[in-house]
């Protein structure tokens, strides 16, 4: 509603004009300054004679009230603005009672202020002394706490230093056993190469000597043994590398924690010895409101304790691995040496068998050669005998042939004729028998020659086998590494 003015008996107001007015709506102005300036009722002090009695006033909208009507409702007296036109005469501002009351109030306020000031002075003096003692006590407690903190830091520093020394020693020991394991693994390559070379050379055996004998079985077992030992050594080498990484990680955490402890110890020791007269003390505004802490005493102690426990656990695992590696080196060296001895024993037995077989073959070959010589002599004697018997046969047959020329009745089957016929048959049968014996002897000679060739071939085979086993294989196996080298010592 727009307020137009008032008289002694009435107040005039009507709804705001249409939007054709050049002034903005009061509601718009009110909404644009909402919550900026609180609503205040105009007082009498604003109604001065020189101010106009018609003006605009910021209105406040009460949504729970009914629309304003000049007929049914009147303007509330608390919201009515006084105007100069309402005054009938000039009036004074205060009464004598107000004046006395004001003086009394001033005196009372003065007494109260002085009393409060005196009490404040006494309380302040007492407060200064109390706070001074409290601050000194607080500073002493802080110094004591810093001293306890320094002691805790020194204790954990000594624990970390001791554990760090132990870890460094364990790491060095594990590094040494790892180097021995690497050297032992390298040393196994030589025996493995020797075993494979022996198998390769024995493949060059000839004929029946290319047999899967005990020596070859032991050589294959030696290769398997060495490969198995190498695999176990590689596995322990991988474990050693992993354990070294864990040890170095734990050592790094200890070194980092030790470095932090040393820095904190220097700082807290410096803070403990700071006094009010010390150099370097200054104001650092707001530092107490900055909470840069990342732990509490429990988690702080647990952090270092966990690092120490982790280091101890890694050291125990490292010591166990070292013991296992040491045992592995000894066991693998013994296994390889035992198998090496088995192979050598098998070679020795096989060489002895081959030498014995070779000697027997040589004996049989000698006898065969002798028999060949004898059978050749027999063949010559048979041929000579056949030749001699042929002369008797020719004489007998010539006699018979001559007697066939006897004339007429002289061709008598007399005793001489019968004897000559029997002689021819007898000599011819003898020659046939000798010729059969000659053929048999020649067949026997051929068989003996074949046997001789076979024995000579077998002798060459045995000689080749002996050369391979005795000269090549056994000579290579003389360079087998010692037990000390197999366990990693130079």
UniProtKB/Swiss-Prot annotation:
Disruption phenotype: Sperm with reduced motility (47%) and forward progression and increased flagellar structural bending defects. However, normal fertility is maintained. The gene is Tekt3. Residues 415-461 form a coiled coil. InterPro entries: Tektin-like (IPR048256), Tektins (IPR000435). Belongs to the tektin family. It is found in: Cytoplasm, Cytoskeleton, Cilium axoneme; Cytoplasm, Cytoskeleton, Flagellum axoneme; Cytoplasmic vesicle, Secretory vesicle, Acrosome outer membrane. It comes from Mus musculus (Mouse). The lineage of its organism: Eukaryota, Metazoa, Chordata, Craniata, Vertebrata. It is a peripheral membrane protein. GO terms for cellular component: acrosomal membrane; acrosomal vesicle; axonemal A tubule inner sheath; axonemal microtubule; cytoplasm; outer acrosomal membrane; sperm flagellum. Transmembrane segments: none annotated. Expressed preferentially in testis. Expressed predominantly in late pachytene spermatocytes and early round spermatids. Expressed in spermatozoa. Microtubule inner protein (MIP) part of the dynein-decorated doublet microtubules (DMTs) in cilia and flagellar axoneme. Forms filamentous polymers in the walls of ciliary and flagellar microtubules. Required for normal sperm mobility. This is Tektin-3. Microtubule inner protein component of sperm flagellar doublet microtubules. Interacts with TEKT1, TEKT2, TEKT4 and TEKT5. Interacts with CCDC38. N- and O-glycosylated. Ubiquitinated, leading to its degradation. Deubiquitinated by USP16, promoting its stability. Its main location: cytoplasm. Keywords: Cell projection, Cilium, Coiled coil, Cytoplasm, Cytoplasmic vesicle, Cytoskeleton, Flagellum, Glycoprotein, Membrane, Ubl conjugation. The keyword Cell cycle does not apply. The keyword Amino-acid biosynthesis does not apply.
